[in-house]
């Protein structure tokens, strides 16, 4: 199968877009975007058939490739972890630009691939970063990403939310499950454990917020990624808990995507 034919057939698959195809050609077949234009009749090896089959089965291109680029790092991904979204990268980059995490203790809760905590650890080598997830398989992926990116100031804990967390932190950052049970998702490949959180999608936030006084320092701060449209319900959860003040921030698409918590004065 030629490069040109692979591209044509891949783009005929619903949900597959040109950036996905170009990434696959580059990362798996070492074919650049220039090669696609000037050398489109070049033959690809037999993996091309297998990859088209996987795309037809709605497997995300990131899982086919096995890694993504995130905040300047290579992050390994597989079906044990969510594929980091650009909103998460936006959160990380904004935090790293506005907060000096040097010599601070940070928890990446529900860490998945580790993209959030490892990005902070990489940029602030004097920080102490703990990454936690209920899934040992996810922790294994995060540990591999620590090795790939040559990070020395990150450790890992298997924990059901905050149940096994004993330390107190200056900052807690979390992209927890927030999809209501029974919601149809774009792909069946991503782990349900990292997606779904009760009938309203907010159970994970309730569990975390109720235990924050035990793991957050007096002047500590919390940053959540949230689903647009749930901000009022989340602020109500924070208000009922009574200790913290919640502030909603919008992303670059002007959607309510982040919630920031700190103690009331």
Whereabouts are the PLM-identified features?
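N-terminal auxiliary segments of SAM/dcSAM-dependent transferases
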Residues: 1-65
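Short, solvent-exposed loop/helix junctions and linker helices
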Residues: 15-18, 42-45, 82-86, 198-202, ...
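Short linear capping/connector segments at secondary-structure termini
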Residues: 37-41, 67-73, 190
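Short, glycine- and charge-enriched coil/turn segments that flank and shape catalytic ligand pockets
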Residues: 41-46, 97-105, 126, 163-166, ...
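SAM-dependent Rossmann-like transferase core, predominantly class I methyltransferases
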Residues: 50-124, 129-144, 254, 260
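S-adenosylmethionine
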Residues: 126-128, 134-264
């Amino acid at each position: 199968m030629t490069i040109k034919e692979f591209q044509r057939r891949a783009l005929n698959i619903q949900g597959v877009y040109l950036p996905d195809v170009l990434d696959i050609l580059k990362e798996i077949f070492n074919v650049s975007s220039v090669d696609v234009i000037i050398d489109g009749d070049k033959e690809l090896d037999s993996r091309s058939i297998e990859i088209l089959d996987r795309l037809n089965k709605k497997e995300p291109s990131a899982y086919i490739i096995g890694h993504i680029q995130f905040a300047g790092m290579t992050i390994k991904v597989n079906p044990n972890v969510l594929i980091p979204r650009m909103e998460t990268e936006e959160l990380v980059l904004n935090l790293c630009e506005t907060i000096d995490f040097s010599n601070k203790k940070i928890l990446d809760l529900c860490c998945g691939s580790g993209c959030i905590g490892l990005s902070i650890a990489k940029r602030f080598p004097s920080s102490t970063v703990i990454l936690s997830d209920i899934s040992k398989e996810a922790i294994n992926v995060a540990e591999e990403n620590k090795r790939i990116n040559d990070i020395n100031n990150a450790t890992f804990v298997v924990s059901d939310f905050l149940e096994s967390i004993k330390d107190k932190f200056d900052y807690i950052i979390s992209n927890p499950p927030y999809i209501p049970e029974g919601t149809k998702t774009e792909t069946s490949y991503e782990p349900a454990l990292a997606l779904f959180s009760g009938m309203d999608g907010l159970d994970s936030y309730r569990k975390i917020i109720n235990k924050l006084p035990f793991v957050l320092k007096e002047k500590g701060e919390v940053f959540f990624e949230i689903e647009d449209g749930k901000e009022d319900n989340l602020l109500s959860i924070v208000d009922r808990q009574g200790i913290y003040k919640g502030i909603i921030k919008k992303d670059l698409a002007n959607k309510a995507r982040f919630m920031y918590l700190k103690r009331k004065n």
